[in-house]
């Protein structure tokens, strides 16, 4: 009886070590934080999204990127919305 219990334990341990038991779980890798973005002229960079805090002095492509990725859109005379 002890031999059977020992063999069952070893077999289940081997399956866990090979990853056969938990096939349906969370398998995606943990995303890495975004790389450091150098500050651009026109205002400080927000540390969590890489978009300037103010709309002044940024290029059109950067403003469009911040708007499409984060919903932070620049409007003439109003600054960011969202």
UniProtKB/Swiss-Prot annotation:
The signal sequence is 1-19
Q: Tell me the Pfam families matching this sequence.
A: Penaeidin (PF05927)
Q: Which GO terms describe its biological process?
A: defense response to bacterium; defense response to fungus; killing of cells of another organism
Q: Which key words tag this protein in UniProt? A: Amidation, Antibiotic, Antimicrobial, Chitin-binding, Disulfide bond, Fungicide, Pyrrolidone carboxylic acid, Signal
Question: Which compartments is it annotated to reside in?
Answer: Cytoplasmic granule
Q: Which residues carry this modification: Serine amide?
A: 81
- The main place the protein resides is cytoplasm
Q: Which InterPro entries match?
A: Penaeidin
Instruction: Report if keyword Disulfide bond is assigned.
Output: yes
- Show the disulfide pairing: 51-66, 55-73, 67-74
* Residue positions where Pyrrolidone carboxylic acid is found in the record: 20
> What sections of the protein cross the membrane?
none
Give me the Gene Ontology terms describing cellular component. Answer: cytoplasm
Molecular function per GO: chitin binding
Q: Which domain of life is it from?
A: Eukaryota
Q: Which family does it belong to?
A: Belongs to the penaeidin family.
- Entry function: Antibacterial and antifungal activity. Presents chitin-binding activity.
In its UniProt entry, what is this protein called? Penaeidin-3g
Organism of this sequence: Penaeus vannamei (Whiteleg shrimp)
């Amino acid at each position: 009886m002890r031999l059977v219990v020992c063999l069952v334990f070893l077999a289940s341990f081997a399956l866990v070590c090979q990853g056969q038991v938990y096939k349906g779980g969370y398998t995606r890798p943990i995303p890495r934080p975004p790389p450091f973005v150098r500050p651009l002229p026109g205002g400080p960079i927000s540390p969590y999204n890489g978009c300037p805090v103010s709309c002044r002095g940024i290029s059109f492509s950067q403003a469009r990127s911040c708007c499409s990725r984060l919903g932070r859109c620049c409007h003439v005379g109003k600054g960011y919305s969202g």
